[in-house]
């Protein structure tokens, strides 16, 4: 289910988004959704690195499965703190 929202942003960010949409031949809504999704992933990685989130919580925050999150963390060069429960959760 999708929701519609209205946001305010400064001119610099608006121009940045407009530029991206032109380069990618996309629309503004898609660019915002993509950036939000990327932000979720980066937030999840950061919280996992700091120890503020377990692997399962980080995966949930990023909108990924535990296995996908493990792969993503490896791509970011983040050392895994996988415990037995985390491993079993990913199966």
Question: Where do the model's predicted regions map?
Answer:
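Short, amphipathic alpha-helical "recognition" segments used to contact nucleic acids or chromatin
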Residues: 40-50
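Short, solvent-exposed charged binding patches
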Residues: 19, 50-91
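Short amphipathic alpha-helical segments
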Residues: 7, 17, 24-36
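Short Lys/Arg-rich basic patches
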Residues: 1-9, 80-83
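DNA-binding alpha-helical recognition surfaces that contact promoter or target DNA
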Residues: 30-34, 46, 60, 71-72
């Amino acid at each position: 289910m999708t929701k519609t929202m209205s946001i305010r942003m400064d001119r610099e960010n608006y121009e940045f988004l407009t530029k991206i949409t032109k380069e990618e031949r996309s629309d503004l809504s898609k660019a915002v959704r993509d950036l939000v999704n990327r932000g979720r992933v980066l937030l999840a990685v950061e919280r996992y690195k700091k120890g503020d989130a377990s692997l399962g919580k980080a995966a949930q925050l990023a909108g990924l499965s535990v296995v996908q999150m493990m792969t993503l963390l490896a791509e970011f060069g983040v050392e895994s703190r996988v415990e037995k429960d985390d491993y079993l959760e990913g199966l």
